[in-house]
Amino acid sequence: MDQLEMKKIAARAALQYVKPDTIVGVGSGSTVNCFIDALGEMAGDIKGAVAASKASEERLRALGIEVFSANEVTELDVYIDGADEITPQGYMIKGGGAALTREKIVSSLAKKFICIVDASKQVDVLGSTFALPVEVIPMARSYVARQLVALGGSPEYRESVVTDNGNVILDVYNFKIFEPLKMEHTINNIAGVVTNGIFAQRYANVTIVGTPDGAKIIE
């Protein structure tokens, strides 16, 4: 079974957490695209969605799902998103698609974070297989990079990428994260950082892993 099929299995399993007549929080990325496509079958049963990226907004609208802004809602029942890495505790690295800031905002509105992944995204230590994205105000790029080096990382500027917020991304390589919550706060306190891709303060409450044997749910 290929990776796409496993993503579809996880995405479809997440539908059980979507209640009728609610507004659903939706992230971004390839696994979320599978979820949005599945959610299209419930378009008439839900009020709509709040999306974490412009690309997700467009995909939702194309399926007839009304899109609300984060400022129009006070709370979401669930937020459903993928991850680049996830630990058994539900800590994640996200931001491969450069939507990390909006993903943090929308996920913070939700009572429950449902993370949908294929088995390749499971790790014991964050930073094992994926670089840590950091969204940075453009004028602070070099300063922030030096601070990330001081923390032990190897930051690289993600060229030709501008976030939906008009900022740039530094990807931090060779950077294993043994204390995710502490490191999330440390990096966010660097002047010029908008946010980083560690999701430890807002961790996943439920992880759904797509496998060749079906969906594995970790709560």
From Swiss-Prot:
Give the EC number(s) under which this enzyme is classified. 5.3.1.6
Question: Which Pfam families does the entry link to?
Answer: Rib_5-P_isom_A
Q: In which pathway does it act?
A: Carbohydrate degradation; pentose phosphate pathway; D-ribose 5-phosphate from D-ribulose 5-phosphate (non-oxidative stage): step 1/1
Q: Which family does it belong to?
A: Belongs to the ribose 5-phosphate isomerase family.
Listed A to Z, the keywords are: Isomerase
Asked if the keyword Isomerase belongs to this entry, the reply reads yes
Role of this protein: Catalyzes the reversible conversion of ribose-5-phosphate to ribulose 5-phosphate.
Q: What is this protein called?
A: Ribose-5-phosphate isomerase A
Q: Which organism is it from?
A: Glaesserella parasuis serovar 5 (strain SH0165) (Haemophilus parasuis)
- Catalytic residues, per the record, are E103
**Cysteine pairings via disulfide bonds:** none
Instruction: Provide the GO biological process annotations.
Output: D-ribose metabolic process; pentose-phosphate shunt, non-oxidative branch
SUPFAM superfamilies, sorted? D-ribose-5-phosphate isomerase (RpiA), lid domain, NagB/RpiA/CoA transferase-like
Q: Catalytic activity, per the record?
A: aldehydo-D-ribose 5-phosphate = D-ribulose 5-phosphate
Where on this chain does substrate bind? S28, G29, S30, T31, D81, G82, A83, D84, K94, G95, G96, G97, K121
Could you list the residue ranges that cross the membrane? Answer: none
Q: How does it assemble?
A: Homodimer.
Q: Name one GO molecular function term.
A: ribose-5-phosphate isomerase activity
